[in-house]
């Protein structure tokens, strides 16, 4: 009687990175290209280099059948000013009968997340809005430590010092209510476009600042947002590196 060949495991690990304003998402996909089922797949990620923190536990894929993919996401934050990030992952799994354990690893990924250096370039408000509509964006809101009317010019000057051109500025005040809006634009050395719009508003004792950032290149969203937020927090007297 002819014996059938044992089914083989063929596990491939495919890493990737996605960008958010306040986090980097490290993505690890485990693909089963073999004929046997893998069980108890554990994916452990680790920052190998750079001023970053990854404090999430290992992620599990209980069953990975042939031809299927299991994916885990890990959120990475910056300890201080972002720099170069190197991240990797280890994958442990068992064969279908649970008798033999296996390990695999994701090739390390290294990416430069330093905030871009910009130069101010004037464009018309209409052109700024048109560029912003075609850019990747992120929004943020901060509670201001003092009234919006005093904080607004401080914020505007701080952004100008970061190499951004002030395109437009509008203020409105009536009684205890104040609203200030300003838009900025700049280019980095590769001529990637960046923009920021801030809206400071206050009524009675409550004041907030809305921040809207736009980037032309996805990989610069994290660093640019960090720079804008840090500059604003420092200018108004808040710790620059806190979330």
Regions found by a protein language model. Give the residues of each.
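Structural beta-strand segments of beta-rich domains
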Residues: 22-26
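Acidic, serine/threonine- and proline-rich intrinsically disordered appendage/tail regions
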Residues: 1-20, 80-243
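Short beta-strand and strand-turn-strand segments in soluble, beta-rich domains
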Residues: 9-10, 39, 48-60
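Short acidic, flexible loop segments centered on an aromatic residue
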Residues: 31-51, 90-92
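Short proline/glycine- and polar residue-rich coil/turn motifs
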Residues: 61-70
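Short, hydrophobic beta-strand segments
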Residues: 70-80
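Short edge beta-strand/loop segments characteristic of extracellular beta-sandwich folds
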Residues: 27-33, 75
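A short interface-forming secondary-structure element
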Residues: 31-33, 60-62, 214, 218
């Amino acid at each position: 009687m002819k014996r059938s060949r044992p089914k083989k495991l063929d596990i491939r690990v495919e890493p990737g990175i996605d960008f958010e304003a306040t986090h980097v998402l490290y993505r690890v996909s485990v693909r089963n290209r073999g004929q046997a089922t893998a069980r108890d797949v554990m994916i452990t990620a680790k920052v190998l280099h750079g001023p970053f923190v990854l404090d999430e536990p290992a992620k599990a894929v209980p069953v990975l059948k042939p031809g299927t993919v299991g994916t885990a996401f890990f959120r990475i934050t910056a300890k201080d000013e972002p720099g170069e990030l190197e991240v990797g992952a280890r994958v442990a799994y068992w064969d279908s009968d649970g008798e033999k354990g296996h390990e695999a690893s994701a090739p390390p990924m290294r990416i430069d997340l330093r905030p871009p250096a910009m130069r101010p370039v004037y464009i018309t408000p209409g052109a700024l809005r048109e560029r912003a509509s075609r850019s990747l964006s992120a929004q943020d809101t901060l509670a201001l430590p003092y009234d919006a009317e005093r904080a607004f010019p401080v914020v505007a000057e701080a952004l100008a010092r970061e190499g951004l051109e002030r395109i437009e500025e509008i203020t409105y005040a009536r009684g205890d209510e104040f609203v200030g809006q300003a838009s900025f634009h700049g280019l980095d050395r590769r001529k990637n476009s960046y923009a920021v719009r801030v809206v400071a508003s206050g009524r009675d004792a409550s004041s907030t600042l809305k921040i809207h950032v736009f980037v032309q290149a996805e990989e610069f969203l994290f660093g640019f947002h960090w720079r804008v937020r840090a500059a604003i927090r420092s200018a108004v007297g808040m710790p620059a590196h806190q979330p």
